[in-house]
């Protein structure tokens, strides 16, 4: 089961008790689902969905609010995966004008959908509209792979309406045109969490948050491992360089020609190739800190470099 299906199934279990919220969900279905269509004289309304729970929800709300029992037909795809789709049709003359009047919609053409400003005045109604918008045309990617939530609409006005509503919640929504549709989408994980909270998908929200936490932990572990690997590589390379310089000094002027403190550090460096600066300092008499050890080893590097330059003349 896809994550989109999980979210939609959860949303369909949310019970509505207020008529205003039920009407707001119907508005979401109308605008986002492109519910109305013109067929010459007859005016038909139809919504098609592959989600059985959403089909039942639409049927129930229309029956409770308008006393309409949509005609339901089921279609099974002949393709390999055999998808099942549910079509709900409101036949002509079944209070269609009443539905339009409630939403301030005066025409069937997509560019003239004008919902009444008061329809989404309440916070609960705005949430109901956004919930229905996602149920009608929304999808969300598997959070294990990427963060992406979108709602596909059939007209720019509907997409902009969604964007305006989400702007009020400080959710950054962008709109793109894709194959004749207008898609409002969200890309940031934290803002997708906020959207799921608004529409009431709290179970899916927690699942997404868990995934985000695990991904953050994995990323942090990877950063730490990469940092430690880089530091280890740096330490190994430094050790190799230091030992080469010590051997070069020994083969040219001899280590015993150096001050006693440099002879001592050269001796432990050669004996303990994998030791850190701190560990080398612990082996000296008296003990020396990391900065002191590093200073002496740099002195050996400088001496070796001077000898090389003199030999090249």
UniProtKB/Swiss-Prot annotation:
Keywords: Cell cycle, Cell division, DNA-binding. Residues 276-309 bind DNA. InterPro entries: Homing_endonucl, Sporu_reg_WhiA_N_dom, Sporulation_regulator_WhiA, Sporulation_regulator_WhiA_C, WhiA_LAGLIDADG_dom. It holds the Pfam family WhiA_N. One of its GO terms (biological process) is cell division. It comes from the Bacteria. GO terms for molecular function: DNA binding. Belongs to the WhiA family. NCBIfam families: DNA_bind_WhiA (TIGR00647). Involved in cell division and chromosome segregation. This is Probable cell division protein WhiA. It comes from Ruminiclostridium cellulolyticum (strain ATCC 35319 / DSM 5812 / JCM 6584 / H10) (Clostridium cellulolyticum). The lineage of its organism: Bacteria, Bacillati, Bacillota, Clostridia, Eubacteriales. The gene is whiA.
């Amino acid at each position: 089961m896809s994550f989109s299906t999980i979210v939609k199934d959860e949303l369909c279990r949310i019970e509505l008790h207020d008529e205003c919220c039920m009407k707001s969900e119907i508005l979401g279905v109308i605008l986002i689902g492109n519910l109305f269509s013109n067929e010459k004289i007859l005016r038909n309304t139809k919504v098609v969905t592959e989600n059985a729970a959403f089909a039942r929800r639409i049927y129930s709300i229309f029956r409770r609010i308008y006393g309409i029992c949509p005609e339901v037909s089921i279609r099974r795809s002949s393709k390999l995966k055999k998808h099942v789709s549910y079509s709900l049709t409101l036949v002509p003359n079944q209070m269609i004008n009443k539905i339009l009047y409630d939403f301030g919609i005066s025409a069937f053409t997509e560019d003239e959908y004008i919902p009444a400003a008061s329809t989404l005045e309440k916070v609960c109604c705005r949430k109901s509209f956004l919930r229905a918008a996602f149920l009608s045309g929304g999808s969300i990617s598997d959070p294990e792979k990427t963060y992406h939530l979108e709602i596909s609409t059939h007209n720019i006005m509907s997409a902009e309406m969604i964007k305006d509503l989400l702007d009020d919640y400080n959710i950054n929504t962008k709109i793109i045109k894709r194959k004749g549709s207008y898609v409002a989408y969200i890309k940031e994980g934290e803002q997708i969490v906020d959207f799921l909270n608004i529409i009431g998908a709290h179970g899916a929200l927690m699942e997404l948050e868990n995934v985000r936490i695990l991904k953050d932990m994995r990323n942090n572990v990877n950063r730490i491992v990469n940092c430690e690997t880089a530091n280890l590589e740096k330490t190994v390379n430094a050790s190799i360089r230091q030992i080469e310089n010590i051997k070069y000094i020994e083969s040219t002027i001899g280590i015993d020609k150096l001050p006693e403190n440099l002879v001592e550090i050269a001796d432990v460096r050669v004996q303990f190739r994998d030791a850190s600066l701190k560990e080398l300092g612990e082996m000296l008499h008296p003990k020396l800190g990391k900065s002191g050890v590093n200073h002496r080893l740099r002195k050996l590097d400088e001496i070796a470099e001077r000898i090389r330059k003199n030999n090249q003349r």
